[in-house]
Amino acid sequence: MPSLRTERRSFGMETPRHSSFRMAEVLYVLSCGGQLEHPHMINVQYPVHQPGPTLRDVKTRLIALRGRGMPDSFSWSYKRNYKDTFIWCDLFDDNFILPLSESGEYALKATKRFDASQVKYLRPPRRSENLEAEGDVSMVVKKGLVLISDTGSVTSNRTMELNKQLMNSLSHSRSAAAVRNNEHSDVSSSDTHYSYEDVIERKDYPARCKSNSGATKRGKASVTPKQCHPSSRPAYWEFSPQGNRTGREDSLMTIGLTKHVVEENEGPTTPRAPARRRTWKKEIDKITIFRESNNSESSDDEQPSVQAETHVSKLSKSGGSYSAAPEDLFLYILRKATRLGSFKPRVCTEVDVVDSTQSKTKMLFRSKTKDEVNRLLYHSPLKQDQSIKK
């Protein structure tokens, strides 16, 4: 029987002969932020059937030496001869690493991967001064409200101090905004302007405005409108029609937040508001219509037409409002409408008077039976007068 020593020697001698892996020395350099570190050298095992080591074999060796996340945080490339110089060829995990033709060495370079999430801006994006001031004020208000609302941990003295700081910061930001507006404004006026907060605090502001407007009316014949403060909010104006107006003055009323009461004199070129369409509704007895149509003479047709046109033109020019139309114009239109064609019982519902001095009548026709027409004609006053004369 062979001894134990002989068996151990034979086993040790046969192991390198029947080994399925080869060893290769690989030189690699790490590049971080454009700077190359000192080169490193490691021994990499790869199978015998391969022409050379792959990138996966190198990563397996580096994971055992430096940890699992190190190889994947770099992009790898190997050095290769190209014409009279050399180049770096990028590698994937299954690509073979080719040696240099002159020395037969394996040279690798590892470049740090680019991560967009870790990139930070050198400075925050710009914001306008007004937005910064509003943001600071809002933060102060929020902090003050949070601290003041916590009554369990904040004493009364601390609460008073926080309230003072809050009011001071608000007043400071308000004054700074007013200074900026005054610097950039072209308004040059010596009148006293009131801000939005002053109007809220002083409740007698509308009364003082009315008194000032009354004094200016008595003192001056022509009033020039005051210039509004540049920081004031836009006001909404609406014309208020007045029946009895002296001269050609128009009064303006403000809706919402009123800043000033402005009065203007209408010049010859001032555009007027378009005339509104007015409608009067009235019902007249059919017997009265028949009596008026038969008793009126043909010579009177021209005179009411002139009066009607004159009256309609006055209505369109005047700015006052009327509750009902005049009686003569209405009856004249009804007489004209009744004479056209044969007489039929009709009821007038409404009359439209337009700015163009034209009148329109809307008549609702309805068919009547012969009995109703005869009864209407028989009981009419005109028919009774004729029967009495006979």
Curated annotation (Swiss-Prot):
Keyword check for Chaperone: no
InterPro entries registered for this protein in UniProt: SOK (IPR010369), SOK_DIX (IPR048351)
Subcellular location per the Swiss-Prot or TrEMBL entry: Cell membrane
Source species, domain of life: Eukaryota
Family: Belongs to the SOSEKI family.
Note: 'Soseki' means cornerstone in Japanese.
Protein name: Protein SOSEKI 4
